[in-house]
Protein backbone atom coordinates (compact mmCIF):
# COMPACT_ATOMS: atom_id res chain seq x y z
CA UNK A 1 0.00 0.00 0.00
CA UNK A 2 1.39 3.39 -1.04
CA UNK A 3 0.43 6.42 1.06
CA UNK A 4 0.95 9.93 -0.31
CA UNK A 5 1.04 12.79 2.19
CA UNK A 6 0.49 16.02 0.28
CA UNK A 7 2.56 19.12 1.03
CA UNK A 8 2.09 22.66 -0.27
CA UNK A 9 2.96 26.21 0.67
CA UNK A 10 0.76 27.14 3.60
CA UNK A 11 0.05 23.56 4.71
CA UNK A 12 -0.61 23.43 8.45
CA UNK A 13 2.33 21.53 9.95
CA UNK A 14 0.50 19.20 12.35
CA UNK A 15 -2.21 18.51 9.75
CA UNK A 16 0.30 16.46 7.76
CA UNK A 17 2.96 15.66 10.38
CA UNK A 18 0.47 14.04 12.78
CA UNK A 19 -0.83 11.53 10.23
CA UNK A 20 2.72 11.12 8.89
CA UNK A 21 3.95 10.08 12.34
CA UNK A 22 1.21 7.50 12.76
CA UNK A 23 1.42 6.07 9.25
CA UNK A 24 5.23 6.15 9.05
CA UNK A 25 5.47 4.43 12.45
CA UNK A 26 3.20 1.73 11.03
CA UNK A 27 5.30 1.42 7.86
CA UNK A 28 8.64 1.28 9.68
CA UNK A 29 7.56 -0.67 12.75
CA UNK A 30 5.74 -3.41 10.85
CA UNK A 31 7.47 -3.71 7.45
CA UNK A 32 5.68 -6.99 6.76
CA UNK A 33 2.42 -5.02 6.41
CA UNK A 34 3.70 -3.65 3.09
CA UNK A 35 3.13 0.04 3.71
CA UNK A 36 5.16 2.67 1.83
CA UNK A 37 4.74 6.34 2.72
CA UNK A 38 6.05 9.41 0.95
CA UNK A 39 5.44 13.14 0.65
CA UNK A 40 4.43 14.80 -2.61
CA UNK A 41 4.17 18.44 -3.66
CA UNK A 42 4.07 20.70 -6.70
CA UNK A 43 7.65 21.77 -5.93
CA UNK A 44 10.43 20.00 -4.08
CA UNK A 45 10.56 22.60 -1.29
CA UNK A 46 7.52 24.01 0.48
CA UNK A 47 7.08 26.51 3.30
CA UNK A 48 4.34 25.46 5.68
CA UNK A 49 1.86 27.70 7.51
CA UNK A 50 4.07 28.37 10.54
CA UNK A 51 7.23 28.80 8.46
CA UNK A 52 8.66 25.27 8.52
CA UNK A 53 10.49 24.44 5.29
CA UNK A 54 10.12 20.88 4.08
CA UNK A 55 11.61 18.96 1.17
CA UNK A 56 9.08 16.68 -0.49
CA UNK A 57 10.09 13.16 -1.51
CA UNK A 58 8.39 13.57 -4.88
CA UNK A 59 6.76 16.06 -7.16
CA UNK A 60 3.48 15.01 -8.73
CA UNK A 61 5.39 14.07 -11.88
CA UNK A 62 7.67 11.58 -10.08
CA UNK A 63 5.34 10.21 -7.41
CA UNK A 64 4.13 6.62 -7.58
CA UNK A 65 0.36 6.21 -7.85
CA UNK A 66 -1.00 6.24 -4.28
CA UNK A 67 -3.52 3.91 -2.70
CA UNK A 68 -4.24 6.47 0.04
CA UNK A 69 -3.92 10.27 -0.02
CA UNK A 70 -3.65 12.56 3.04
CA UNK A 71 -4.53 16.17 2.12
CA UNK A 72 -3.79 18.62 4.95
CA UNK A 73 -5.40 21.97 5.59
CA UNK A 74 -3.88 25.36 6.19
CA UNK A 75 -3.85 28.77 4.55
CA UNK A 76 -2.68 27.22 1.27
CA UNK A 77 -6.05 25.55 0.78
CA UNK A 78 -7.72 28.89 0.09
CA UNK A 79 -6.04 29.17 -3.33
CA UNK A 80 -6.41 25.43 -4.00
CA UNK A 81 -10.20 25.66 -3.81
CA UNK A 82 -10.17 27.82 -6.95
CA UNK A 83 -7.29 26.12 -8.77
CA UNK A 84 -8.60 24.02 -11.65
CA UNK A 85 -5.43 21.90 -11.88
CA UNK A 86 -5.54 21.02 -8.17
CA UNK A 87 -9.22 20.13 -8.30
CA UNK A 88 -8.68 17.98 -11.38
CA UNK A 89 -5.73 16.22 -9.69
CA UNK A 90 -7.95 15.40 -6.70
CA UNK A 91 -10.65 13.99 -8.95
CA UNK A 92 -8.08 11.95 -10.88
CA UNK A 93 -6.65 10.51 -7.65
CA UNK A 94 -10.14 9.50 -6.55
CA UNK A 95 -11.00 8.12 -9.97
CA UNK A 96 -7.76 6.12 -9.84
CA UNK A 97 -9.07 4.32 -6.77
CA UNK A 98 -7.16 6.10 -4.00
CA UNK A 99 -8.75 6.35 -0.58
CA UNK A 100 -8.99 10.12 -0.14
CA UNK A 101 -8.44 11.55 3.33
CA UNK A 102 -8.18 15.12 4.54
CA UNK A 103 -7.35 16.99 7.71
CA UNK A 104 -8.72 20.37 8.75
CA UNK A 105 -9.51 22.66 5.81
CA UNK A 106 -8.26 20.06 3.34
CA UNK A 107 -11.90 18.98 3.28
CA UNK A 108 -12.82 22.36 1.77
CA UNK A 109 -10.64 21.55 -1.24
CA UNK A 110 -12.32 18.14 -1.50
CA UNK A 111 -15.71 19.87 -1.36
CA UNK A 112 -14.68 22.25 -4.15
CA UNK A 113 -13.59 19.21 -6.21
CA UNK A 114 -16.98 17.56 -5.67
CA UNK A 115 -15.69 14.65 -3.56
CA UNK A 116 -18.01 15.36 -0.64
CA UNK A 117 -21.28 15.63 -2.56
CA UNK A 118 -24.03 13.82 -0.61
CA UNK A 119 -21.53 12.59 2.01
CA UNK A 120 -21.05 13.25 5.70
CA UNK A 121 -17.88 15.24 6.41
CA UNK A 122 -16.14 17.48 8.90
CA UNK A 123 -13.47 20.18 8.97
CA UNK A 124 -11.79 22.61 11.36
CA UNK A 125 -14.35 24.20 13.68
CA UNK A 126 -13.61 27.70 12.33
CA UNK A 127 -14.66 26.69 8.80
CA UNK A 128 -17.72 24.50 9.43
CA UNK A 129 -19.99 27.13 7.85
CA UNK A 130 -17.71 27.37 4.81
CA UNK A 131 -17.95 23.61 4.28
CA UNK A 132 -21.74 23.83 4.27
CA UNK A 133 -21.67 26.83 1.90
CA UNK A 134 -19.35 25.13 -0.60
CA UNK A 135 -21.76 22.26 -1.11
CA UNK A 136 -25.17 22.23 0.61
CA UNK A 137 -25.51 18.47 -0.05
CA UNK A 138 -22.75 17.73 2.49
CA UNK A 139 -23.98 16.32 5.80
CA UNK A 140 -21.70 18.49 7.95
CA UNK A 141 -20.66 16.88 11.24
CA UNK A 142 -19.31 19.77 13.36
CA UNK A 143 -18.58 17.72 16.48
CA UNK A 144 -16.84 14.74 14.87
CA UNK A 145 -13.07 14.20 15.22
CA UNK A 146 -13.20 12.39 11.88
CA UNK A 147 -15.85 11.05 9.51
CA UNK A 148 -15.36 7.89 7.46
CA UNK A 149 -17.78 7.85 4.52
CA UNK A 150 -16.17 4.95 2.70
CA UNK A 151 -14.13 6.34 -0.19
CA UNK A 152 -13.45 9.63 1.63
CA UNK A 153 -12.36 10.21 5.24
CA UNK A 154 -12.31 13.76 6.64
CA UNK A 155 -10.83 14.88 9.94
CA UNK A 156 -11.53 17.96 12.00
CA UNK A 157 -8.77 20.46 12.71
CA UNK A 158 -5.09 19.90 13.19
CA UNK A 159 -4.58 17.26 15.92
CA UNK A 160 -7.65 15.30 14.76
CA UNK A 161 -5.48 13.99 11.92
CA UNK A 162 -3.72 11.74 14.43
CA UNK A 163 -7.02 10.16 15.43
CA UNK A 164 -7.97 9.75 11.78
CA UNK A 165 -4.65 8.09 10.96
CA UNK A 166 -5.05 5.60 13.80
CA UNK A 167 -8.54 4.85 12.47
CA UNK A 168 -7.01 4.24 9.04
CA UNK A 169 -4.55 1.72 10.48
CA UNK A 170 -7.47 -0.08 12.14
CA UNK A 171 -9.56 0.05 8.96
CA UNK A 172 -6.78 -1.04 6.61
CA UNK A 173 -5.13 -3.61 8.87
CA UNK A 174 -6.63 -4.25 12.32
CA UNK A 175 -7.66 -2.65 15.58
CA UNK A 176 -4.81 -4.53 17.26
CA UNK A 177 -2.25 -3.02 14.87
CA UNK A 178 -3.69 0.46 15.46
CA UNK A 179 -3.32 -0.08 19.22
CA UNK A 180 0.29 -1.18 18.72
CA UNK A 181 1.03 1.93 16.66
CA UNK A 182 -0.72 4.15 19.22
CA UNK A 183 1.37 2.64 21.99
CA UNK A 184 4.56 3.00 19.95
CA UNK A 185 3.99 6.73 19.40
CA UNK A 186 2.77 7.02 23.02
CA UNK A 187 -0.43 8.78 22.01
CA UNK A 188 -2.76 8.86 24.98
CA UNK A 189 -3.83 12.48 25.27
CA UNK A 190 -4.75 14.01 28.58
CA UNK A 191 -4.59 17.74 27.92
CA UNK A 192 -3.44 19.76 30.96
CA UNK A 193 -5.96 22.55 30.33
Each model region followed by its residue ranges:
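Small/polar loops that bind or transfer phosphate-bearing groups
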Residues: 7, 123, 156
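Structural detector of well-ordered beta-strand residues that form the stable sheet scaffold
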Residues: 100-101, 122, 141, 153
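Conserved alpha/beta-hydrolase "nucleophile elbow" surrounding the catalytic nucleophile
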Residues: 103, 158
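A short glycine-threonine-serine/GTX helix/turn-capping micro-motif
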Residues: 151-157
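Generic beta-strand structural signal
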Residues: 147-148
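Short, glycine-/small-residue-rich phosphate/pyrophosphate-handling segment
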Residues: 115-133
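Extended, subdomain-level signal for the structured scaffold at the beginning of enzyme domains
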Residues: 1-100, 107-112, 129-143, 162-193
